[in-house]
Amino acid sequence: MKRNILILLLLSLSWAAAAQQSTTLSGTITDEASGDPLPGVAIFFPDLRQGALSDMQGRYTIGSLPQIRTQIQVSLLGHQTIVRDIDLKTVRTLDFSLKESNATLSEVVVTGLTGTETKRNSPAPVTIVTPEILRGQASSNLIDALAKQPGVSQITTGGGISKPVIRGMGYNRVLVVTDGVRQEGQQWGDEHGVEVDAESVNSVEILKGPASLMYGSDALAGVVVLHGAAVPPQGKIGVRAGAEYQSNNGLLGYTVNTSGNQNGLVWNWRWTQKVAHDYRNAADGLVPNSRYRERGVSGLVGLSKRWGYSHLKLSWFHLTPGMVEGEREEDGTLEAFDNGKSYRPGLPFQQVNHYKAVWDNSLVLGEGSLKATVGYQQNRRQEYEESADEPGLDFLLHTVNYNFYYKSPESNGWKNVAGVGGMWQASDNLGEEVLIPAYNLFDAGTYITTCKDLGYWHISAGIRADARWLRSHALEDRFAAFDRTFLGITGSVGAIRNLGENANLRLNLSRGFRAPNISELGSNGEHEGTFRYEVGNPDLKPEYSWQLDAGFDYSSRILSAEVSLFTNLAQNYIYLGRSAGETVEDAPVYRFLSGLASLSGGEATVDVHPVERLHFENAFSWVIAVRPGEPEESRYLPFTPAPRWLSTLRYDLIRDGKVLNNTYISAQMDWNFAQNRIYAAGGTETATPGYILLNLSAGTDFRLKGKTVASLYLTADNLLDTVYQSHLSRLKYAAVNPLNGVQGVFNPGRNLGIKLILKW
């Protein structure tokens, strides 16, 4: 009966949506100073996921649009982005004049919030990572590519595994959202990365601070929202192919992509492969078993019509990383089983398969819209220790995600959104070894948000209620069964004061919530690659936090600057602490503890343009994480990133040439300060000295008859081959070198990279 009611409801909504009248929008885009037409300008409707590119005469046409009020975004590299509200009931023609700008703080639409909103009107800090930034870097994985953004760090284990950290918090405090659903892949583990093909990601939004309002539990630190490429314009079919090479670990990467739009029938398919042998540094030489292999297949097929869109997204991601053990010979060299140039991981290694199917829908209902997303994920994570034939550890996780929200018509200037969302999970242990108990989980949340423009002011607020039920299964002599229920009320209120066209002040107060994960509650075992034996606590309480954000930004033709400050007080903050003198099978024992925590810090960025086309970009980020009232050795929260200063000098050689376009050269100083604020109790962690890395890069697009047909990028990271250890590298705690008494394995040395992208 319930199923029939649901089917009737969906059919009625579909009929209502189909009744929408369609319209067409066209226009011309020119340069404000010269009046010349601008080709290659991206015109995009974020709510509708539709767009187009301007032709050689600067003209564009987008058809099959619903007659609604929505937002349009117009952007071109080297020019100020325009974001404007538009009523498609009355507007049929709309021209734009783009102003050339050196400023990096341009206006964009943020879709990771409740509905769409401009970055200018977001009271909480948001970082936008553009396609140009992603393509212009040499990275081992997606999170590695994001880790140079202010306030973002990564926990690494070897060459191919990275976990995001936002403002000093990671693991289950940072959500990764892709294809509209939260990524679920056993993210409680140190050596469990993010199972996403980096080539399938076109742009990224990084929401800093508690985002529990939209996403529920686990968004205490923030959210990383991954976006694929927009649906191609009507009648367009495109093919892209890319290849890259990196010298340090011999990385070879290939990707092929095809996409198209025929009368609203859209598709986008991609295949990717990446292999790397052991990386090297000047202290350790080749680091045995730091190699990895990666493959990915993803596809989208669906309809984009006047009533909205309905897309089915399918993906498979496979990763086989070697696990660095860091054992050493008497002469201090790392124990190796081959010459380090093989692309096949040796024992121990992981084998990760992540399957995902997402049905993503957006229906236009009168002046409002309904967004409905349902997803299924299967994560199979196997670890081979003694034999390549049978895994010792074998995790199988099933997840069903759901998210529905309704964006009501604007009423007296108020924009309201109401929604529900949550997930169901079932996890099982299929191997002989176990670390966590098998479990079932279900959570659900409901929320409402509102915002309004009041002249120079923009205000927003929201509230959410969450409930999570978790039941673990007993295993004789290892795990006792337990049932837990976690309830949380979260919310936020914020305001922005526009100080004219170029500057803004913002203030936001938010309440965060996070239920303990299964590892914190029930773990009991040693995981290869973590160098420790972890013991959970089934009596842990959920984390609650209050965070205050304050910010200021300014942007002009020659200067852009942004300052974001925060202070966060978290109750029942969960962390790992080493039990002094306690070991299990020679592995040190770490137990999950909790208590009051205070985190504060921020990010400051300044981009100065002393002459035309010259960018001098500086970004400084820091966080201080303490446990109030605790003695010095246990005063600081463990594994907090060190302060960091990124300084980049970039010159745009050619911006709009007939053959070469967007041509640049860049030099960067990456200064990671010493981290002496450590959790020293029980030897949990050690201090890390500071280091400076020098990076160079260059890139250009190639044009043929006004269209970009290829892009080339060259990079040189750690040019001086500096020997260093990141404070958040798990390999920092590998075995001690008997020759010099230094513990752990060092990070990669000099790395030269080349990347070529072809477009048809």
What are these regions (language model features)?
Residues 23, 29-33, 56:
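Short solvent-exposed capping/turn motifs at the termini of beta-strands
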Residues 35-39, 61-69:
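Short Pro-Gly-centered beta-turn/loop motif in secreted/extracellular proteins
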Residues 1-26, 43, 760:
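Bacterial Sec-dependent N-terminal signal peptides
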Residues 65-66, 86, 99-101, 169, ...:
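Hydrophobic loop/turn residues within beta-sheet-rich immunoglobulin-like superfamily modules
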Residues 48-59:
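Short, acidic Ser/Thr/Gly-rich low-complexity loop/linker segments typical of extracellular
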Residues 59-64, 95-97, 699:
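Exposed aromatic-hydrophobic patches
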